[in-house]
Amino acid sequence: MAKYLINARVEVDGVVEKHDIIGAIFGQTEGLFGEQFDLRTLQDKNRIGRIQVMTKIHNGKTIGELIIPSNLDRLETALVAAMIESVDRVGPYSARIEVVDIIDVRLEKIKKIIDRAIEILHEWSKEKAPDIKEILKEMQEALKVPEPQKYGPEQLPAGPGVDESDTIIIVEGRADVINLLRYGFTNVIALGGARKVPNTIKNLAKKKKVIVFLDGDHGGDLILKELLRTIKVDFIARAPEGREVEELTGKEIREALSKAVPTREYLEKLAKQGNKEAQYLLQVQERLAREVAEQIKPQVKVEEKKPVEKPVPKPPKTVEEVVEAVSIPLRIREDIKSLYGTLEAILYDNEWNSVKRLPVRDLVNTLDELDENNVQAIVMDGIITQRLIDKASEKKVKMIIAAKIGRINYKPPEILILTFNDIM
């Protein structure tokens, strides 16, 4: 963009063309101040731009306007303007050129910027200033404890996060729900005082990881036994002995949930102490886990020794999905045991070497950062979701082994999905 625009008026005592005027300017200024300041040389070096000529014929004369862009400094631009004024003939006719103005393009641009800034400032000042009352009201709403909702056909007291979360916390009554909501636990639902486990709870337990959080008294023991006989329970948390969930502080709630024990571990400990009912409940829980896992039941072989490669027969032509047999090293079972209750995942390469161990909540984002084919398998103490399957398919993951399988709308045929119960 040029720094200056030389604006001049031209008058010729005869009828001439535009190129005649331009030729006269170049011809009559050539060599006046040496080759370095010749107009053609300056134009070749982009120091001045193309000369624009606008003319019209009036009473046998040619009159018009010249515009010459200049990238020279102020002194040199003024000299070029004076050189142009020195032209006194165009062809056989007398001519007069007079510089009318030299426009500083940068100043014009600055002026436009200032004008626009003033306009923006006026528009900005018209906007409504923030109302402190509205701000305080928004802050108050943010701190407001959400009210329990009525969930399912049985109208069970529940928090607003039950549907969105992949884990639910089952408590006894409405007061327990209110107390957990007060401290930010929104994925909580109550049994609602029912003698039997409501169907809503049964259905949720088939799709989500379940944490049972009950009072530390005999009543809590009875409710826990009923739940263990009816639904798949993943973790068991209890209030301190003699205390109720509804009276716990936020710190006590977090501490109790952080100490939640995997159901298998809880029952095995009681069974070792000779508790026959615990042995029975352990068998019930294993059966319930298998029933949930049968949503997707592939063939799997856990190898006791180093696998020997065998030719894989071509799959039969059928509309049904065919899942091929897969060899999993025995040590992966130890990795699964180490994952129980941690809510963590381990990524493996094609040789079943551990690539990374990370929290389940970071799994999708971590996969997103990895290149394709970097991860062959994922073992995770969590629930397999459609979002995870979609990302795993994108990254060419071949296998996912998890504690539980959530609601899946589509499973790519190239991904094998297993639960811990399939392996253990």
Swiss-Prot record:
One Pfam family here: Toprim_4
Enzyme class: transferase
GO biological process, one term: DNA replication, synthesis of primer
Domain Toprim: 166-241
Catalytic activity entry: ssDNA + n NTP = ssDNA/pppN(pN)n-1 hybrid + (n-1) diphosphate
Cofactor remark from the record: Binds two Mg(2+) per subunit.
Its EC number(s): 2.7.7.101
Position of the signal peptide: none
One term of GO molecular function: metal ion binding
Needed cofactors: Mg(2+)
Binding site for Mg(2+) 2: 215, 217
Residues where Mg(2+) 1 binds: 172, 215
Entry GO terms, CC: cytoplasm; DNA-directed RNA polymerase complex; exosome (RNase complex); primosome complex
Record keywords, A-Z: DNA replication, DNA-directed RNA polymerase, Exosome, Magnesium, Metal-binding, Nucleotidyltransferase, Primosome, Transcription, Transferase
Functional summary from the UniProt entry: RNA polymerase that catalyzes the synthesis of short RNA molecules used as primers for DNA polymerase during DNA replication. Also part of the exosome, which is a complex involved in RNA degradation. Acts as a poly(A)-binding protein that enhances the interaction between heteromeric, adenine-rich transcripts and the exosome.
Annotated family: Belongs to the archaeal DnaG primase family.
Subunit organization: Forms a ternary complex with MCM helicase and DNA. Component of the archaeal exosome complex.
Protein name (database record): DNA primase DnaG
Species per Swiss-Prot/TrEMBL record: Staphylothermus marinus (strain ATCC 43588 / DSM 3639 / JCM 9404 / F1)
Gene that specifies this protein: dnaG
